[in-house]
Amino acid sequence: MTWLEYHELTKHSAESLRRTQHYLDWANIPNPFRHYEGVRVVDLPVDPPAPQISALEVLGGKTGNTLARDGAEFLSQLMFYSASISASKRVPSSGAIYSLRVNPSSGNLHPTEFHFCTRGLVDWSDGLYHYRPSSHTAEQRAIGDFGTKLINNSAPLIFVLTSIAWREAWKYRDRAYRYCLHDIGHAWQALTLAARSLGSESFAMGHFLDDRVAESCLLSADEWPMLIVGLHGPSIPLNKLNADETVVFGGQPNRLSEEQKTYPLIESIHTATKLSTESTIPSLGEPKASGRGEITLPSHVSASRSFGDVVRTRRSALDFKGGRESISFPQLATLLSATGERLFADFATHRYVHLYL
């Protein structure tokens, strides 16, 4: 299985839409929240203070600051403004209640899970944790220095972003892997921007041995490591490193559905993307320039709401009003400028993604 083969087999067409007889099995919808039974659950401080730096400044690469005094306060701020529940809504027809989160997700299905390793945080045990957004808590799955064992990295805070493909496959079937990658990108940038608003920087790693990371993070078979993000910076409250012995608790992951279906095509493409040896990232050449002319963009807009306010009130656009409520050309120029900011990642040495309007 190659990327091109997967793309051809799962791309939309008039014929594929006509043939489909898929329906949504609401009785078997996957649980959007993973948790682990039999582990210690660590409460994070409620209502953490909002980062006051403007959203546009964060998008432009400027760092904010935090008054967090210990690991719990810093982690609470970081997760509250990157991956927590931001609102709840009720379905008028059924009365069912569903949650919205800070990080966007296609179909609001949230295949991404946030695992993290801590090292040297003030008043916080070194170890492996899983963030539980349903209660804004951290599940302690192991004690010890897992970060350096995981990827030989000395960052005090290392996140492993994973995907549970079944959550997307329930709706999108074989196309689900596309959405898993899409959502990983959303989660990565939500985490990166929240960290920046608190005075920290990040570096993402997509080049790692998948099976080794999955084993080190005690992941179940239905959950795949997709991206590793290390955080560093003077704003992270640190003390001298502990030398705690490694103790593994593990925990039993909850069952997400009564019936969890498998999709061989998704399994095949994921296997094709995995690294099993210490190989290097293939080098890609620069694409040829296209277009017939250049347009000089106007000056950026300066007024902006605070980062904390923006991310907590973000919603998905269901329609576009247009007319007088359309964004201005300077506003568009500001957004375009933000998309050109450098990505700090081991796969960003070449220009893999290009934006066309």
Model-derived features: positions:
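N-terminal accessory segments that position/regulate proteins before the catalytic core
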Residues: M1-L357
